[in-house]
């Protein structure tokens, strides 16, 4: 099973609605490591590392996010593998 890291920028109504908390929960449920971080432009940056299948599941979940959010756009790219412990909310 291949391991990958993906960095995604999630735009829409994603700050102040529990998006990072739910993203971290989904990531941990999938055995992923990484973080979810608010950015000054109102988007959320998500870094997810783990099995390709589980990273893809998280990316699919990010398309809708929690019910309290509205996702308008996701830009994602595969980046160099890095080891991170846990899934942080920044």
UniProtKB/Swiss-Prot annotation:
PANTHER family: ACYLPHOSPHATASE (PTHR47268:SF4). It is an enzyme of class 3 (hydrolase). Pfam families: Acylphosphatase. Disulfide bonds: none annotated. This is Acylphosphatase. Keywords: Hydrolase. The keyword Metal-binding does not apply. Its EC number is 3.6.1.7. The keyword Zinc-finger does not apply. The active site is at 20, 38. Belongs to the acylphosphatase family. Coiled coil: none annotated. InterPro entries: Acylphosphatase (IPR020456), Acylphosphatase-like_dom (IPR001792), Acylphosphatase-like_dom_sf (IPR036046), Acylphosphatase_CS (IPR017968). One of its GO terms (molecular function) is acylphosphatase activity. Residues 5-90 form the Acylphosphatase-like domain. It catalyses: an acyl phosphate + H2O = a carboxylate + phosphate + H(+). The lineage of its organism: Bacteria, Pseudomonadati, Pseudomonadota, Gammaproteobacteria, Vibrionales. Gene3D superfamilies: 3.30.70.100. It comes from Photobacterium profundum (strain SS9).
